[in-house]
A protein has these predicted regions:
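A short, conserved alpha-helix in the catalytic core of glycosyltransferases
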Residues: 43-54, 59-86
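Non-catalytic, C-terminal membrane-associated alpha-helical segments of glycosyltransferases
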Residues: 100-165
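Short beta-strand-to-loop element that shapes/binds the nucleotide-sugar donor at the catalytic cleft/hinge
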Residues: 2-16
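Structured catalytic cores of enzymes that bind and process phosphorylated ligands/cofactors
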Residues: 2-5, 43, 74, 91-92
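Active-site donor/metal-binding and catalytic loop motifs
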Residues: 76-108
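A recurrent flexible, glycine/aromatic-enriched loop bordering the glycosyltransferase active site
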Residues: 24-45, 113-114
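Short, hinge-like loop/turn segments at secondary-structure boundaries
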Residues: 18-22, 98-101
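Short secondary-structure capping/turn micro-motifs that flank functional sites
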Residues: 66, 89-90, 147
């Protein structure tokens, strides 16, 4: 499987394509590079891979389907690589300022609606993904984490998130 790399048009930094085991994005360097976590904006899936794995898991309607497909392929002994060069570009200013896992500066109801929306990080879908690839314990912990951080007041979240993000 080959994932196409996308760069930011002004800075020429990689912003999408694939990342390594530590979740660092992999930049174009003229060679195919191993990918752990596939980002699926531009992907070439050979017929033999599709014949073995099939379509994306239907449970994933927006988020995590690409990552799941790449991990499933690797679990079945296949490889995922980056393209050798950037094949697309975008303007970072067009990217959403809202994180999938928590929307700031809104009330709890709107925050939870976003979390459970197709553009959020639906905890049940994320639980399914985490259980499939990281086990039940990780899935349970992350499920509760998503709800906990969405209950935090913005002032607390802003302090805590600076430490992590």
């Amino acid at each position: 499987i080959i994932t196409g790399l996308v760069e930011e048009k002004t800075s020429h930094k990689v912003i999408y394509g694939g990342s390594n085991a530590t979740k660092r994005l992999i930049a174009a360097n003229g060679q195919l590079n191993d990918v752990t976590f596939l980002n699926g904006n531009f992907v070439i899936v050979p017929r033999y891979v599709f014949d073995k794995i099939g379509f994306l898991d239907k449970l994933f309607h927006h988020d995590l389907g690409d990552v799941d497909y790449g991990l499933t392929a690797q679990e079945q002994g296949m490889h995922v690589y980056t393209s050798r060069c950037y094949i697309g570009c975008t303007d970072v200013a067009l990217r959403s300022k809202h994180m999938r896992i928590r929307m700031s500066n809104v009330g709890f109801i709107k925050r939870f609606k976003r979390l459970y929306s197709p553009l959020g990080s639906n905890p049940f879908i994320t639980f399914y993904f985490k259980r499939k690839h990281q086990g039940y314990l990780n899935a349970f912990i992350y499920f509760f984490y998503l709800h906990f951080i969405n209950l935090l007041p913005d002032a607390v979240w802003n302090k805590v998130s600076r430490l992590r993000y």
